[in-house]
A protein has these predicted regions:
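A metal-dependent, Asp-based hydrolase signature
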Residues: 82, 87-166, 170
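N-terminal carbohydrate-binding/catalytic regions of secreted carbohydrate-active enzymes
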Residues: 48-67, 80-81
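Asp-based phosphoryl-transfer active-site loop
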Residues: 66-80, 271
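Bacterial N-terminal signal peptides that target proteins for export
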Residues: 1-10
Length: 335
């Protein structure tokens, strides 16, 4: 039996654990979306869910077909001032630099080490791919998972001074929980690296790793010291963005979604694919309009560019969420 003092230490440890970890929202029966103002988007979500879950309704969708897909960057968590995975890659360059003296004179690594983000951006997609390959490959999948978890445990958003996993959108956490409570299976379909996201999605969003779809690099089965491991190779396998998203949905989920949520041009095809379903379909864009509580951006930004979606949404019956107007709070720590 534990001594009384030991029991209190254990209880305190548990309390502290749950105090620092973002809680997965549980839907309130009276109002499952309490952080949403009572405006058009909230009503549209509630009306759609009611119609597709009511047996006998012409829009009824069987539980097996209730698939909802969510982008991650800018839809579930903050993507400014840069994608979180890019911040991870930049930190990895600095950590690995002593083992790579050639990086001091090789772009885009030189710009990273010099703190020249404009130089990094100028390297374009080719340079960013080199950064990813140089910092994400050459290790086993298990080693990479540990690296990601260790980084997320200490890295903070530069503006909010909170762990990145706390810079998640409270209204979207409520939405995820609400849909699951109504028989939906929730998936993340993101341009981010699938093995970067899987270490935290279950804890933060309630989405298990097998329901996370993302961009991938190639892996290879090898024996290391007589034990089988999967090695991450410095080669791109698939980019899960734009037209690649419906392809990945078909390939890895195997069902056409009923609901799709995004925030950028990279999500357009996913919403288009979802809302031309045989079932009634629902598409929603999160529009970043709140510079005070978060960030305001759309057509002119490097991260989360949104133009065609804004123009096409009214014509296609897609919902556009104005963050400033529609959300009572943005982050859990702002409640």
């Amino acid at each position: 039996m534990l001594a009384r003092g030991c029991r209190w230490v254990l209880i305190l440890a548990v309390v502290l654990l749950f105090a620092v970890a973002p809680a997965i929202s549980q839907p309130d029966k009276a109002d499952p979306l309490p952080s949403w103002n009572d405006t058009t988007p909230k009503k549209a979500i509630n009306d759609f869910v009611a119609k597709v879950t009511k047996e006998g309704s012409p829009d009824f969708v069987p539980v097996a077909d209730r698939v909802a897909v969510f982008d991650n960057d800018g839809t579930l968590w903050c993507e400014h001032p840069m994608y979180v995975q890019l911040a991870f890659a930049l930190d990895r360059v600095k950590a690995l630099a002593p083992k790579h003296p050639e990086w001091r004179t090789t772009e885009p690594f030189k710009s990273v080490l010099d703190g020249n983000l404009k130089g990094v951006a100028a390297s374009g997609e080719k340079g960013l791919a080199e950064l990813i390959m140089g910092t994400h490959a050459g290790m086993t999948v298990d080693e990479f998972e540990v690296t990601v978890k260790d980084w997320l445990a200490t890295a903070e958003h530069p503006r909010f001074r909170r762990p990145y996993t706390e810079c998640v959108y409270q209204p979207m956490l409520e939405l995820l929980a609400y849909l699951r409570a109504n028989g939906f299976k929730t998936f993340i379909v993101s341009g981010g690296g699938v093995e970067f996201m899987r270490p935290f999605t279950a804890r933060v969003y309630g989405v298990p790793p097998e329901q996370v779809v993302g961009s991938t690099i190639k892996t290879k089965y090898v024996l290391r010291d007589g034990k089988p491991v999967l090695m991450r190779l410095p080669e791109i396998d698939f980019i899960d963005d734009k037209a690649g998203k419906p392809v990945c949905i078909h390939k890895f989920i195997g069902r056409r979604p009923v609901m799709a949520f995004g925030n950028s041009a990279g999500d357009f095809e996913m919403l288009e694919y979802t809302t031309t379903n045989n079932h009634r379909g629902f598409g929603l864009f999160v529009h970043h309009t709140d510079a005070e509580r978060e960030y305001a951006y759309d057509r002119k930004t490097e991260f989360g560019h949104l133009d065609k979606g804004l123009d096409e949404a009214p014509k296609r019956g897609w919902v556009v969420v104005d963050m400033k107007k529609e959300w009572k709070v943005i982050y859990p720590f702002q409640k």
